Amino acid sequence: MLPDTLEGSIHDLTQNILADYTAGRPIDRIEPFNQPDRDVIIALIGKLRRIVFPGYFRDPAYHVYSAAHSLSALIEDTAYLLQKQIAIALRCGSSVTQEAAADIDRQAQEMTVRFLEKIPDVRALLATDLQAFYDGDPAATSLDEIIIAYPGLLAITVNRLAHELFLLKVPLIPRIMTEYAHGRTGIDIHPGATIGKYFFIDHGTGIVVGETTIICDSVKLYQGVTLGALSTRGGQSLRGHRRHPTIGDRVTIYSGASVLGGDTVIGHDAVIGGNAFITHSIAPGMRVSVKNQELEMRMMKDVNW
């Protein structure tokens, strides 16, 4: 039970905060049922991973009488939840008439079907990514280990799924998906980024890949790499313009390197050394490295710390 002094203040505190909600700012909206449900979208990621990797991430709710029966039930659940969330996202932030709502529901159903039709294409890309992980990491003992445990493959899986929704112009949901992966893995890949086959992320923590980045085939990124935009005063006026670099085939970028700018192209077969800061194009086959800083070594008895 609350102390008398605090209990007597609850009414006034409530009224003060309610009054603050009337200021008309974006943060003052009270429409919790007119926005996509993040928890449902996270649950959808789990269902989609089970569709993509049918031998892994089993849900005990689905009893496997046959692969077809199990998959049919899983796809039905996924389609139902996804089309509901897409419809909410399409309505979000706007007033919708009853007639328009019916059109939105039809559009959401069409988007859901078109997205699910892309699952085989996504799986084909992920099969190449899985092979790139295995070929590129001698510490990997099996493909099972990579699928189950590697954060890089989780981030890429979520991104490839979210990218298909992004291409369908589904609002909000692709970003919710990739930010979930970001929180789980420390790998921040915008759903708008275009990524080719055989993509390998080693370790991965701290990697940032911006919206208009183009990554070609067989690219390898190490932890802490940024494929970003140059900071300008353009702000929202730059939306829709190329702001992020293009990374050619078979490029390797080592830890801590930053490659920035929409006009920056890293040519095929180039290697970018750790901690490099690049804002201009690099020719194919080049090796870029930061000159080693000089190390000073002294005996501990001469060091006052």
Q: Regions from the language model: what does each represent?
A:
Residues 1-176, 303-305:
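Terminal amphipathic alpha-helical/low-complexity segments used for targeting or macromolecular assembly
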Residues 141-143, 160, 182-184, 222, ...:
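Residue-level signal for pocket-adjacent positions within structured domains
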Residues 161, 179, 226-228:
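Double-stranded beta-helix
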Residues 165-197:
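Short, conserved active-site entrance elements at the starts or edges of catalytic domains
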Residues 185, 190-191, 196-197, 202-211, ...:
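Left-handed beta-helix
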Residues 236-243:
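Regulatory activation segment
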Residues 282, 300-305:
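C-terminal functional extensions of proteins
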